[in-house]
Amino acid sequence: MSLGAGTDTRFFRLLDAYPDLRLVYHEIDFPTNTLPKIACIQRHAALRRKLLHAPTTSTSYHSATYNIHALDLRSLAAPSEGVPLPELPNLDPTLPTLILSEMCLVYLQPQTVQSIISTFTTHYLKPTTPTSIVLYEPILPHDAFGRTMISNLETRNIRLPTLTTYPGLGDQRARLSGYGFTNGAKAADTEFIWKQWISEDEKERVASLEMLDELEELELLLRHYCFAWGWRDGESDVFSKAWGDVREQV
């Protein structure tokens, strides 16, 4: 379940890399973002051929393997009395589910984010369903770099409410535990991931593409973004088996 998926093509890249993968992929984004995405898929035969059937609407797509939900994510927060939650076709409440947020939830108020996650873990999914989450967000708002970043964004009327609420890796871990991901809650900044997870061959490949002359500036930038991942095992330890040994930053 990819939140605020935008123009991301991960579903198609996964199909290319793992053609036999048993996967049901969901994306949620504003209709203004899903409209050009579906139009792009329809224009390109290489993408269109990977769908089980052609899109029948301009902003949404639903099939047994790929789903694009044209929704305001905030509509999944605690609904008003008498207002039902949106339907998410083809979301099986019993299948192990991974929720992805790459610079999406950071734009919402923390209480709204908590409500959205709770809606997934208690309404759309059964409480016994193995469920996990991966967040990619900025951190460290209070040092010089962080203050400058916030100031620059505010000049464009952009605010990141969760940045100051969860400023460090420990805060991100506690956040995930508070969401109910009690079997695992880990985090690492992207500098750690670059140095510890990425092979030397891959680093050399990227360096040749990007011409990374200012390594210190890169590392400063990487320290201000993080991945946080958490899970609940439910009826199965599928995520503990998959992620239990993934090295985090301590």
Language-model segments: residues:
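Conserved beta-strand/loop positions that form the S-adenosyl-L-methionine
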Residues: 1-4
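Active-site alpha-helical segments that house and flank conserved acidic catalytic motifs
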Residues: 7
